[in-house]
Amino acid sequence: MLSPQTISYKTLLEKAWPIILANASVPLLGLVDTTVIGNIGTAQDLGAIAFGALIFSFVYWGFGFLRMGTTGFAAQADGAGDQEEVRAVLARSLLLAIGLGLFLILLQWPIKQAAFSMLSGSESVEKVAQSYFSIRIWGAPATLCTFALMGLLIGLGNSGQLLIVQLFLNGLNIILDIWFAGFLEWGAQGIALGTVIAEWATVAFASVLIFRELSRREICETAFFPIKKLRDRGPFVKLLSANADIMIRTLILVFSFAYFVNRSSSFGDVSLAANHILLQLISFAAFFLDGYAFVVESVVGSALGSKQNKMFDSAVKKSTILAACTALILAAALWIFGGFIIAGLTDISAVRFEAVKFLPLASAYIFLSFAAFQLDGIFIGASFTREMRHAAMLSIIIFLVACRFLIEPFSMFGLWWAMVLYVVARAAALLLFYPRLRAAVGL
């Protein structure tokens, strides 16, 4: 059990690094898929995977609330020592995940039609991509259940097991993709089938890990899922409300990046390509900052559940210092070595020149983003989701207003300044609600 005395920098780092590795392992899967199809499949297969992966990434990102909502409530229940409620949190989240997953399957035709109406590819690519979609959609319930299961592991502070689950998912997926697409030459359909099988296998694997973990805590004296607690609608309504708030916040975040990319395209193909590269570097930095945010979600939730105010303050202070130092190192590294990194990512001189020109602003974004990541983690751990929704709404308004007044006179520099202002506004908006959070939890 964590305490103010055991919340050391070493402890936080030990909890963060498995999460960072788990996050960083995700792009490896896409790289392997691309390599397999790029060497064995057709151009249509490669294009189909690009389209299909984009659609599912967008859809599943919108359901990220299942992970975040589960983490906060599980951490609080675990901190309070209410292990029966931990199981109830898991059950509610899994029921919601299964329901939403089945809903996606039922609506697969309109989702597919809407998605492909917004994408412009050749007829042959779209035909293969639709086949890919029709197979992968059957993994939706499994993917959403995995979000809930991973959320529980984070809430319980088991970042090591989270890494194991993520490596199992990616490792099995890679093996199946190589087998189906590489050896059997099933192309994009083989990639989709391998992904679906891996997703369902991961649900089973993670469920076994969690069952053993909860059994180790000797909390299975009665039925594993407490039916009596599940009949109480209050906590389920609370979970639905929290998840709705997080979903709105997430969709606003998705919109902000989509808007940034769309405005980038108005400056030409070179500017769009340059900003795409810089956003990939920002995404890489997010793997590290997310690690600390996930840890603070767990520790803050546990501290509030156990009513250890000193533990809350210690966790917030030390994890924020670590995140700030990490962000500074990442930003400095990008500023100093960014030119070499960009040169390795593209040999198009115009794109390289354009990307290097905005390296300082991309570096500033990375450094200043640590506060938004940390505050997100604190608010998720405390289940203060309504305030997260309000903060997201406020910050996107600031971003759009900044774009309105900065882009015309300053062109692409204005767009980047607006983006940097946006990440600062995200943190500032959450800080407005931070005193309310502390007061509500008795700090």
Feature names for model-found ranges:
Residues M1-A16, A74-P141, F183-M247, V300-Y365, ...:
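Short alpha-helical transmembrane segments in multi-pass integral membrane proteins
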Residues K10, S25-V26, F63, L104, ...:
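Alpha-helical transmembrane segments of multi-pass membrane transport proteins
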Residues E14-D33, I135, T146, L169, ...:
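Transmembrane helical elements of multi-pass membrane transporters/channels
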Residues I19, N23, T35, G72, ...:
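Transmembrane alpha-helix boundary and packing residues in multipass membrane permease domains
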Residues L28-G47, F116-E123, W179-W186, M247, ...:
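Helix-terminus/linker motif at the lipid-water interface of multi-pass membrane proteins
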Residues N39-T42, Q76, G155, L184, ...:
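Membrane-helix boundary and inter-helical linker elements of multi-pass secondary transporters
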Residues L46-L106, T143-L162, A274-G338, F370-S383, ...:
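Small-residue-rich hydrophobic transmembrane alpha-helices
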Residues R67, I135-I154, L162-N170, I191-S207, ...:
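Short runs within selected transmembrane alpha-helices of multi-pass transporters and secretion channels
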